[in-house]
Amino acid sequence: MCTGCVQKQYPDRGNTCLENGSYLMNFVGCANCHQRDFVLISDRTMVNEDEEEIVTYLHMCKNCEHVIARHEYTFTVVDDYQEYTMLCMLCGKAEDSISVLPDDPRQTAPLF
C-alpha cells in the first residue's frame, strides 16, 4: 500500500461501507507516475465463509498499474443485525449495523 498516493491514511468514513468503488476525494495522485487519473479495481475476490461475505480488491493506478491500496469489505448477519465493515487506506475505515427486523429495537424510545 502506498502512503504517497493518499491524502489521509484510513480516513474515518463513519458508516459508509463500500463494497465496490473508490474514494477519489482522498486520492492525491499516483506516487509512482505522478498522474491523477482514474483508479482501477483489480484482483477482486468474494469469499463466503461461515456466514460471512468478504470482498477484497486492489486499487491501482490506471496509467502505471501501481498498487495504491488494498480494499476489504465484510458483511455478516449477527443475531438480528446485518453488520458491515470496510478497511482501506484509500477509502477509509467504517462500520455499520442495520436491524433485519421491521422496527430496530435499538431505535425504540422508552415509554416512561
Curated annotation (Swiss-Prot):
- InterPro entries cross-referenced by the UniProt entry: Churchill_sf, Transcrpt_activator_Churchill
Residues that, per the record, bind Zn(2+) 1: 2, 5, 30, 66
Q: Where does Zn(2+) 3 bind?
A: 59, 71, 88, 91
- Coiled coil region boundaries: none
Q: Name one GO molecular function term.
A: zinc ion binding
Q: GO biological process: what's one of them?
A: positive regulation of DNA-templated transcription
Instruction: Copy out the induction comment.
Output: Up-regulated by FGF signaling in embryos at mid-gastrulation.
Among the Pfam families in the record, one is Churchill
The protein's UniProt keywords, in alphabetical order, are: Activator, Developmental protein, Metal-binding, Transcription, Transcription regulation, Zinc
Keyword Transmembrane helix among record annotations: no
Sites where the protein binds Zn(2+) 2: 30, 33, 61, 64
Query: Which range is the signal sequence, renumbered to this chain?
Result: none
Would you identify the family this protein belongs to, as annotated? Answer: Belongs to the Churchill family.
Q: What does this protein do?
A: Transcriptional activator that mediates FGF signaling during neural development. Plays a role in the regulation of cell movement. Does not bind DNA by itself.
What protein name applies here?
A: Protein Churchill
Q: What is the lineage of its organism?
A: Eukaryota, Metazoa, Chordata, Craniata, Vertebrata
